[in-house]
UniProtKB/Swiss-Prot annotation:
The organism of origin for this protein: Shouchella clausii (strain KSM-K16)
Domain TRAM, chain residue ranges per copy: 450-513
Designated name of the protein: tRNA-2-methylthio-N(6)-dimethylallyladenosine synthase
Binding site for [4Fe-4S] cluster 2: C232, C236, C239
Top-level EC class: transferase
Family that this chain belongs to: Belongs to the methylthiotransferase family. MiaB subfamily.
Signal sequence region: none
Subunit structure comment from the entry: Monomer.
């Protein structure tokens, strides 16, 4: 355990005056709070998490991440993972599931059946954290009823100092806390939590190495997430991600391509390349190999659809645009978060581009890929946002004509520069602005969807509609949701659908045969 984390003091968050150190060595520290022993291997530290050293990131290829002594630890037992937040968390949960299945556990969807419950958390907004703490509280009666139940908290919230402090003091029915950098250590940590009976904490503030050969249990047999890089170095002033996910680290191209080829052999129809800042891919690798080069190679692999997320405008280069314009399995959907439409606010956000630069980039992409759908993220109510600045956001949305947008009220994140800014905008004003923004976004989305009326589109069928099990649902290449009546055998397949009704957020249609498609 590092000296920095040995001396970490959580007293600024909670009252640990009754805590006492039971034992301490170079590997771990054991403390006792309110009668429960807590084994701490490492604790979150924002200062350490912010550092960006030029140390080489090692690529580890362990033959087996599951020690022999725990290989059958889960025999006759079940696990449940609840996943909050982004696609990266979904991917991480697939890795955790793979490890637990390798230890002999079975997966369940029933809380009462579970012997292990892991909450894979999101820290991007306060609302997400409140949901997790609500669930932590809801699980306490079950823990009292089943003392042998192991409850773990992992993901981005675990990387926050205040969250770990709150759990240590107020939620002592939690048995295990680990972070985003040491998922591969889950079998070891679980062993300690089960046999040691104390709360176990291991959260690395400094990112770990890239671990290949992770066992993985993919729930979806049609669409797959493929991590191509980890972390973010942008440090936007409102964002906690660089602290919770660490510095940018790219997987080697040959490892990514091998994974994509394997997915193609398994019959997957769609992959999404993942990264917190996906188009910064390759900047930390030797040479000039970038996302455009990777996409160009994947373009040649026999897999019908390839997506990527999430992009930062600063890293969207001309070569990437040229590659995407080839089409083929590279779908016509660009998600490019702008966050705001006013250059002064963008500067305060630390985005390092202006409104005009974003518009120029968007127009360049649209010119190269005319049929592309364009989606974005928007934050309303950044500290001291004026009505005039908000109007700039509305006018940007009008000018770009986004097909859809994820809109949010600014949520301060502890430890970020924006959280220290004074804010004179009342919440009532922020909510009213969000409503106005959503009305505009919905209106444009509806108009854009009307362009699909009576057209035949290619749809990858994802499953039954959430609203009606007699209806199937899937997505177009441009990521529009399409609902239609069809045979269950179509699930997981690519079909053609004629659009009969365009709605604000979805399209309704009827399945058509291949000859009709050719006729059109």
């Amino acid at each position: 355990m590092s000296d920095q984390n040995k001396t970490k003091d959580y007293s600024k968050y909670f009252d640990f005056s009754d805590a006492r150190v039971v034992s301490e060595d170079d590997e771990k520290k054991i403390i006792k709070i309110k009668g429960r022993e807590i084994t701490i291997y490492d604790q979150p530290n924002y200062r350490a998490g912010r550092k960006r050293k030029r140390e080489d990131v090692q690529v580890l290829r362990p033959e087996n991440l599951i020690p022999e002594e725990v290989a059958n630890l889960g025999a006759g037992k079940k696990f449940l993972i609840r996943t909050y937040g982004c696609q990266m968390n979904v991917h991480d949960s697939e890795n955790m599931s793979g490890l637990l299945l390798g230890m002999g556990f079975e997966e369940t969807t029933e809380t009462e059946e579970a012997d292990i419950i892991l909450l894979n958390t999101c820290a991007i907004r306060e609302n997400a954290e409140n949901k997790v703490f609500g669930e932590i509280g809801n699980l306490k009666p079950l823990k009292l009823e089943k003392p042998e139940l192991i409850i773990g908290v992992c993901g981005c919230m675990s990387q926050e100092e205040s969250v770990v402090g709150k759990i240590m003091e107020k939620h002592q029915h939690i048995d295990l806390i680990f972070g985003t950098h040491n998922i591969h250590r889950l079998p070891h940590l679980l062993r300690d939590a089960i046999f040691g009976k104390e709360m176990v904490i291991e959260v690395w503030s400094k990112e770990g190495d890239i671990v290949e050969n992770m066992p993985r249990s993919r729930k979806n047999k049609t669409q797959a997430w493929v991590n191509i890089m980890y972390g973010c170095d942008k440090f936007c002033t409102y964002c906690i991600v660089p602290y919770t996910r660490g510095k940018e680290r790219s997987r080697l191209p040959e490892d990514i391509i091998a994974e994509v080829r394997d997915l193609a052999r398994q019959g997957y129809k769609e992959i999404t390349l993942l990264g917190q800042n996906v188009n910064a891919y390759g900047k930390d690798l030797p040479g000039s190999y970038r996302l455009g080069d990777l996409m160009n190679e994947i373009h040649k692999i026999d897999i019908p659809r390839v997506r990527f997320t999430t992009s930062h405008p600063r890293d969207f280069d001309d070569h990437l645009i040229e590659v995407l314009a080839q089409g083929g399995n590279l779908v016509e959907h660009i998600h490019l978060p702008v966050q705001h439409g006013n250059s002064d606010i963008l500067k305060l956000m630390g985005r390092k581009y202006t409104r005009e630069q974003y518009i120029t980039l968007a127009n360049k992409i649209k010119q190269a890929i005319p049929n592309a759908s364009f989606t974005t993220d928007l934050i309303v109510g950044f500290p001291n946002e004026t009505e005039e600045q908000f109007q700039d956001m509305l006018s940007l949305v009008e000018e770009i004509q986004f097909d859809a947008a994820y809109t949010y009220i600014y949520s301060p994140r502890e430890g970020t520069p924006a959280a220290r800014m004074e804010d004179n905008v009342p919440m009532s004003v922020k909510k009213e602005r969000l409503a106005r923004l959503n009305a505009l976004v919905n209106d444009i989305s509806n108009k854009r969807n009307l362009d699909y009326q009576d057209k035949i589109v290619e749809v990858l069928v994802e499953g039954e509609s959430k609203k009606n099990t007699d209806v199937l649902a899937g997505r177009t290449r441009t990521n529009r949701l399409v609902n239609f009546v069809g045979p269950k055998s179509a699930i997981g397949e690519i079909v053609y659908v004629k659009i009969t009704e365009a709605k604000t957020w979805s399209l309704d249609g009827e399945i058509v045969s291949a000859p009709e498609v050719k006729a059109q």
